[in-house]
């Protein structure tokens, strides 16, 4: 695959301007997301009067299962459609859908309506994958690591502000107001993309190219791609396993009174760690082979995630969450960049859709796994399990790296000529 998978001509879009616009849109989207999502376990208690901790743990798992199943199916579909109809269109679809459906969650009269709305919302929303695809498509090859790292800071910093803002809104006004704020911020993000983001996607030209180039499945799903998807699956389980239970962990350590406020602070610390990780990883990935960064990141992520389970007070939890996020937030950009090294640019939306769906499939697994772990060993057991899964990713790296060395895509210039030959 590698020798034939050359890069297309350099995009005519101003990549720096596009990076700024897409970064800002994703920052706003994550502010909106952070305003409401961390507080779902507390919403179940406050609005729907589900008081039992174990029962709430099961309901939280069902809620996230509905979201993950929907998103797992949708991400691959939207990724393929992005390669056919354009990346900007997919980002707009996700942003406007989120603006419509997230406020409806606060109006759900019971848990099953809540889960149903979340299922529909997840199918049509999800801005991270289309934002990554649009940005990669309009950025020079040698800047891919930089832009993916910078874009990840939008997620972290947006979540950080969103968690703080959401915690304050919930504390002073209530859950309904937080969810409606989320919808309004997503709408602002959608309008920003609508009027300022650029995509030089040509539907007619792409259609002609697709008619000329018919890919067999084994040419697309190469050994290196499949091994990378295994790593995405493991990461999806490890990363998503802990996300729904932060509020429960804070409540376990601190008590219910003030739990919403401290959940916002702990989540903000997580976002601060992710923000710094994005800057560091983006800089390093354009200077070092991304596969060389993965091992130390996995070791640090496992160590600090396990330390979270041992926290005895909120202060220790804030510190360990910051350090864990700093390590773990670097994993996905590294894996995405590894994927761009061995894949065809004209099918990148499809590949990113696959990775997103597989990552989300990890979320489906942890929806079952998380509820069972909480039921059997309490919320602290969830964080120890996540650390173990990160450790298990280490032996999977070896066959992945060996396969990548055989399939590495040699960068090409705007004429399609091999840069090594040009030099």
Model-derived regions: residue spans:
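Juxtamembrane intracellular "pre-TM" segments in multi-pass secondary transporters
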Residues: 2-16, 199-228, 416-423
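Hydrophobic core of transmembrane alpha-helices in multi-pass small-molecule transporters
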Residues: 27, 101, 112-126, 316-330
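Short amphipathic helix-loop junctions that connect adjacent transmembrane helices
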Residues: 39-57, 245-261
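Residue-level signature of mid-helix packing/kink "hotspots" within the transmembrane helices
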Residues: 67-76, 126, 159-160, 271-279, ...
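Conserved MFS/SLC helix-loop-helix module at the cytosolic interface between two early adjacent transmembrane helices
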Residues: 72-105, 109, 285-291
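Structural signature of the two symmetry-related core transmembrane helices
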Residues: 89-104, 183, 292-307, 387
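Cytoplasmic helix-loop-helix junction between adjacent transmembrane helices
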Residues: 117-156, 338
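A membrane-interface helix-boundary motif in multi-pass transporters
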Residues: 171-184, 372-390
């Amino acid at each position: 695959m590698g020798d034939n998978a050359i890069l297309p001509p350099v995009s005519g879009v101003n990549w720096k301007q596009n990076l700024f616009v897409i970064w800002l849109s994703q920052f706003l989207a994550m502010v909106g997301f952070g305003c409401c999502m961390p507080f779902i376990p507390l919403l179940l208690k406050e609005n729907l009067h589900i008081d039992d901790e174990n029962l709430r743990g099961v309901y939280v798992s069902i809620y996230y299962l509905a979201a993950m199943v929907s998103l797992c199916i949708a991400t691959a579909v939207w990724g393929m459609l992005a390669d056919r109809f354009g990346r900007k269109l997919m980002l707009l679809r996700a942003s406007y859908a989120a603006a419509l459906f997230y406020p409806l969650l606060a109006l759900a009269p019971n848990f099953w309506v809540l889960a149903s709305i979340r299922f529909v919302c997840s199918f049509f929303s999800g801005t991270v994958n289309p934002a990554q695809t649009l940005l990669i498509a309009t950025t020079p090859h040698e800047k891919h690591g930089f832009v993916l790292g910078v874009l990840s800071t939008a997620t972290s910093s947006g979540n950080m502000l969103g968690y703080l803002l959401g915690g304050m809104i919930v504390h002073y006004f209530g859950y309904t107001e937080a969810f409606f704020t989320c919808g309004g911020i997503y709408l602002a993000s959608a309008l920003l993309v609508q009027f300022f983001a650029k995509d030089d996607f040509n539907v007619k030209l792409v259609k002609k190219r697709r008619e000329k180039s018919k890919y067999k499945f084994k040419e697309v799903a190469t050994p290196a791609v499949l091994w990378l998807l295994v790593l995405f699956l493991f990461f999806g389980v490890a990363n998503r396993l802990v996300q729904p239970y932060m509020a429960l962990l804070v409540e376990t350590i601190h008590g219910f009174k003030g739990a919403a406020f401290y959940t916002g602070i702990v989540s903000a610390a997580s976002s601060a760690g992710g923000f710094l990780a994005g800057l560091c990883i983006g800089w390093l990935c354009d200077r070092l082979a991304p596969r060389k960064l993965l091992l130390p990141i996995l070791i640090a992520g496992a160590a600090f995630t396990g330390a979270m389970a041992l926290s005895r007070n909120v202060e220790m939890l804030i510190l360990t969450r910051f350090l864990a996020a700093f390590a773990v937030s670097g994993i996905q950009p590294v894996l995405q960049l590894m994927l761009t090294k061995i894949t065809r640019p004209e099918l990148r939306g499809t590949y990113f859709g696959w990775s997103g769906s597989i990552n989300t499939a990890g979320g489906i697994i942890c929806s079952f796994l998380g509820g069972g772990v909480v039921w059997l060993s309490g919320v602290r057991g969830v964080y120890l399990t996540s650390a173990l899964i990160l450790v298990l990713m280490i032996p999977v790296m070896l066959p992945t790296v060996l396969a990548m060395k055989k399939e590495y895509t040699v960068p090409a210039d705007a004429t399609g000529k091999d840069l090594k030959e040009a030099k």
